[in-house]
UniProtKB/Swiss-Prot annotation:
Binding site for Zn(2+) 2: 80, 82, 99, 102
Entry similarity comment: Belongs to the RING-box family.
Name the record gives this protein: RING-box protein 2
Residue spans crossing the bilayer: none
Lineage, highest ranks first: Eukaryota, Metazoa, Chordata, Craniata, Vertebrata
Binding residues for Zn(2+) 3: 61, 64, 73, 87
Length: 113
C-alpha cells in the first residue's frame, strides 16, 4: 500500500458504505450511490473515411466538391459493412467488383446519408 506521512490517512472514495478517512475527521468527501454510463454515436460507420478518395464519408467526395454537387453525394454500405461515397464506389465497381478494403464481392447493403 501507499506510505502515509505524519499519521494522516489518505482520502478514499468508495461506492459503498464504509469508513473512509480524510484530513478533517471521519467524514467522506462524497459517496457514489449510482452511476449510469451513457454513450451515443452520430452514425453507424466502422471507418469514417472513404478508402477510395480519402475524404470523410459524411462530407462530399472530391468529385462532388469540384462539381459543386455536395447535396447529391451519398454514402453506400456493402454487405461487408464497409462504407464509401456512392460516386467513388460506382467508378471503382466498373474496374473491380470487389470491396477495396476486404476484397469480398461487392453487394450493396444500403444507400443513404
Amino acid at each position: 500500500m501507499a506510505d502515509v506521512e505524519d499519521g494522516e490517512e489518505p482520502c478514499v472514495l468508495s461506492s459503498h458504505s464504509g469508513s473512509a478517512g480524510s484530513k478533517s475527521g471521519g467524514d467522506k468527501m462524497f459517496s457514489l450511490k449510482k452511476w449510469n454510463a451513457v454513450a451515443m454515436w452520430s452514425w453507424d460507420v466502422e471507418c469514417d473515411t472513404c478508402a477510395i478518395c480519402r475524404v470523410q464519408v459524411m462530407d462530399a467526395c472530391l468529385r462532388c466538391q469540384a462539381e459543386n454537387k455536395q447535396e447529391d453525394c451519398v454514402v453506400v454500405w456493402g454487405e461487408c459493412n464497409h462504407s464509401f461515397h456512392n460516386c467513388c464506389m460506382s467508378l471503382w465497381v466498373k474496374q473491380n467488383n470487389r470491396c477495396p478494403l476486404c476484397q469480398q464481392d461487392w453487394v450493396v447493403q444500403r444507400i443513404g446519408k
